[in-house]
């Protein structure tokens, strides 16, 4: 993301926090996902009394984008209200993000200070489509060897 895109995404992520549904944790998270063609999709965390049904802000943004046909991303910005530390995506959101490639992940505090990383750096040893392709190719080779 260039600086102008980053600033727009920070604005969008921080502004979206007001819509978070977090009656249990009171921990508002906003996300802004930038597509390769410059469109921004926002997301917020949506909690549920059955905690396992809660969805994070990042996955909300990803599903909004994908449901409208976007699958190529430049970056995602994740905003929280914590002043003393950066909040990074949870493990599920990290795995969800790498499905769409290696792109920038920016975590932002209320004062707009940032921590920058990438989907691949945040999930070392990641499991991806390449692993599934490698397994299919291995199975095909083994099948041919048996015939």
Swiss-Prot record:
<dbReference type="GO" id="GO:0005829">
    <property type="term" value="C:cytosol"/>
</dbReference>
<feature type="binding site">
    <location>
        <position position="93"/>
    </location>
    <ligand>
        <name>Zn(2+)</name>
    </ligand>
</feature>
<feature type="binding site">
    <location>
        <position position="90"/>
    </location>
    <ligand>
        <name>Zn(2+)</name>
    </ligand>
</feature>
<feature type="binding site">
    <location>
        <begin position="45"/>
        <end position="51"/>
    </location>
    <ligand>
        <name>substrate</name>
    </ligand>
</feature>
<comment type="similarity">
    <text>Belongs to the cytidine and deoxycytidylate deaminase family.</text>
</comment>
<feature type="active site" description="Proton donor">
    <location>
        <position position="58"/>
    </location>
</feature>
<dbReference type="InterPro" id="IPR006262">
    <property type="entry name" value="Cyt_deam_tetra"/>
</dbReference>
<keyword id="KW-0378">Hydrolase</keyword>
<dbReference type="GO" id="GO:0006217">
    <property type="term" value="P:deoxycytidine catabolic process"/>
</dbReference>
<keyword id="KW-0862">Zinc</keyword>
<feature type="domain" description="CMP/dCMP-type deaminase">
    <location>
        <begin position="4"/>
        <end position="130"/>
    </location>
</feature>
<dbReference type="GO" id="GO:0005737">
    <property type="term" value="C:cytoplasm"/>
</dbReference>
<dbReference type="InterPro" id="IPR002125">
    <property type="entry name" value="CMP_dCMP_dom"/>
</dbReference>
<protein>
    <recommendedName>
        <fullName>Probable cytidine deaminase</fullName>
        <ecNumber>3.5.4.5</ecNumber>
    </recommendedName>
</protein>
<dbReference type="GO" id="GO:0008655">
    <property type="term" value="P:pyrimidine-containing compound salvage"/>
</dbReference>
<dbReference type="GO" id="GO:0004126">
    <property type="term" value="F:cytidine deaminase activity"/>
</dbReference>
<dbReference type="Pfam" id="PF00383">
    <property type="entry name" value="dCMP_cyt_deam_1"/>
</dbReference>
<dbReference type="GO" id="GO:0006216">
    <property type="term" value="P:cytidine catabolic process"/>
</dbReference>
<dbReference type="GO" id="GO:0005634">
    <property type="term" value="C:nucleus"/>
</dbReference>
<dbReference type="GO" id="GO:0008270">
    <property type="term" value="F:zinc ion binding"/>
</dbReference>
<dbReference type="InterPro" id="IPR050202">
    <property type="entry name" value="Cyt/Deoxycyt_deaminase"/>
</dbReference>
<feature type="binding site">
    <location>
        <position position="56"/>
    </location>
    <ligand>
        <name>Zn(2+)</name>
    </ligand>
</feature>
<comment type="function">
    <text>This enzyme scavenges exogenous and endogenous cytidine and 2'-deoxycytidine for UMP synthesis.</text>
</comment>
<dbReference type="InterPro" id="IPR016193">
    <property type="entry name" value="Cytidine_deaminase-like"/>
</dbReference>
<keyword id="KW-0479">Metal-binding</keyword>
<dbReference type="GO" id="GO:0009972">
    <property type="term" value="P:cytidine deamination"/>
</dbReference>
């Amino acid at each position: 993301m260039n600086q102008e895109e980053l600033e727009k995404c920070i604005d969008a992520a921080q502004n979206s926090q007001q819509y978070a549904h977090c009656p249990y944790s009171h921990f508002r998270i906003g996300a802004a996902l930038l597509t390769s063609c410059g469109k921004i999709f926002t997301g917020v965390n949506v909690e549920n009394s059955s905690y396992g049904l809660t969805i994070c802000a990042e996955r909300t943004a990803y599903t909004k984008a994908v449901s409208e046909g976007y699958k190529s991303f430049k970056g995602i910005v994740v905003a929280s209200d914590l002043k003393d530390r950066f909040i990074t995506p949870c493990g599920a959101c990290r795995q969800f993000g790498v499905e769409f490639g290696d792109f920038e992940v920016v975590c932002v505090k209320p004062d707009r200070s940032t921590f920058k990383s990438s989907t691949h750096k945040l999930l070392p040893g990641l499991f991806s489509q390449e692993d599934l392709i490698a397994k299919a190719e291995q199975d095909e080779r083994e099948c041919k060897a048996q015939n």
